[in-house]
Amino acid sequence: MLELPIISISIFLPLISVLYILLFISQSKKADKAIYVMYVAVLSSVLTFISTIYILIEFDSSNPAYQFIERYAWLDKIGLEFHVGVDGISIFFVALTSFLTLICIIGSLFTVKKYIKEYLVCFLLMESFCIGAFTSVNLLLFYLFFEAILVPMYIIIGVWGGENRIYAALKFFLYTFFGSVFFLLSLIYIYSKIHNFDLTYIPELTGNIPLFTQQILWWAIFIAFAVKIPIIPFHTWLPDAHVQAPTSGSVILAGILLKFGGYGFLRVLLPLFSSVSQEFAIYVIYLSVIAIIYASLVALAQKDMKKMIAYSSIAHMGYVTIGIFSFTEAGVSGAIFQMLSHGVISSCLFLIVGTLYERLHTKEIAKYGGVASKMPVLATFFMIAMLGSVGLPGTSGFIGEFLSLLGIYKVNVIATFIAALGIILGAVYMLKLYKEVMLGEITNKEIMHFRDLYKYEIISIAPLILLIIYFGLMPSSILNVFRLSVESLLVKF
């Protein structure tokens, strides 16, 4: 049986679609070019999603090594190969990328009013680059995809964002690019000593690098991924980016891009510098605890819905980093689960805020109230997403936070109790948000004319709601897939 290069298909199908749109549809003289662009974008995202689901179905969870490996020579002089594969850690992020991209593209067909062709092209490019980064086994290839993601996201915020979109886009780009410079310099040094970028090979050799140099490299790479998560004090770009980004941009930003921080720690930092990671872990843990409490308190004071959810993301990603740097199976498994759960819950919340914004054209909490009486379906969806965000048992949010706290409890009891306070604060600000937006009397007359969710909005939000419940009730179906990969990662710890 001929084996398909299924990962290459997942990476390059969106790129080929972009080329087709730009080279053929754009040159067409037909008046309905935009319709053809929409068809191509939807078909491409559907096929890419199917290909990633095929990978997920065929994946052998009893094998912790990379699977579906493809390896082709490229630029041997600098150690660059097209070397891709998936393991238990990366496979769900690949599926999440294609799933959220499909949701964003479908929703965009009904909400984007200008430059729809360019908008869809940006999302297809981002899908390709994200899948490429999550599947890269060559460290330099990972860096190239990791950096390429910046460009379409910058354009999405800068062109289709809100009133202060240029400022937010520049801030996003400069922060992320700043961190990536340190990453690039580290790669150059590593290659000068090891002459290899194979992620299955170089972890065995980085121990030969002098300890002080390892420490410098560790901090350089840590900063690159800390900006992505983001960890305080590298977080200030995120609230601005979320507030100004269009709804679909916020979905991709929260659902996928923030995950590269935690994924980078798991894929690059811990394997390459295991001993130094143990040495500096306590600092990361306390930074994460500070981030959880600080972001939760700031979220509590917000008057803008998207900014509140943005700060809640910083708090939730804090549980990811404490789980990772606990170096326990429970903690790391919880961190991966938390990233997946947050990707689903935060995406759902941003879509819900987007539906409200489409009707009232404001994200200010005080302008709402009593929406549930006019939009009961949305109110139900919002309730489930909100309960997932606060970590109610039976939802996906509970599993990740519980395992992360269980992992860190074995290492640092004080940090565990402080981090647990973040869960209480999270419940306070999310319940407050729901109460002020959905419940009470209708004080804004425009809300009287609201109609409940349109079909395309239900199609976008309902699958995420189902995943929040499924992940919460059947967590073992997710945890078992990456259990052996986590055990393999933690051998050095």
UniProtKB/Swiss-Prot annotation:
Topology within the bilayer: Multi-pass membrane protein
TM ranges: 5-25, 37-57, 89-109, 115-135, 139-159, 172-192, 216-236, 251-271, 280-300, 308-328, 334-354, 375-395, 411-431, 458-478
GO cellular component, one term: plasma membrane
A Pfam entry, by short name: Proton_antipo_M
Its EC number(s): 7.1.1.-
Listed InterPro entries: NADH_Q_OxRdtase_chainM/4 (IPR010227), NADH_UbQ_OxRdtase (IPR003918), ND/Mrp_TM (IPR001750)
UniProt KW Signal keyword: no
Family from the record: Belongs to the complex I subunit 4 family.
Listed name of the protein: NADH-quinone oxidoreductase subunit M
Organism for this UniProt entry: Rickettsia felis (strain ATCC VR-1525 / URRWXCal2)
Lineage start: Bacteria, Pseudomonadati, Pseudomonadota, Alphaproteobacteria, Rickettsiales
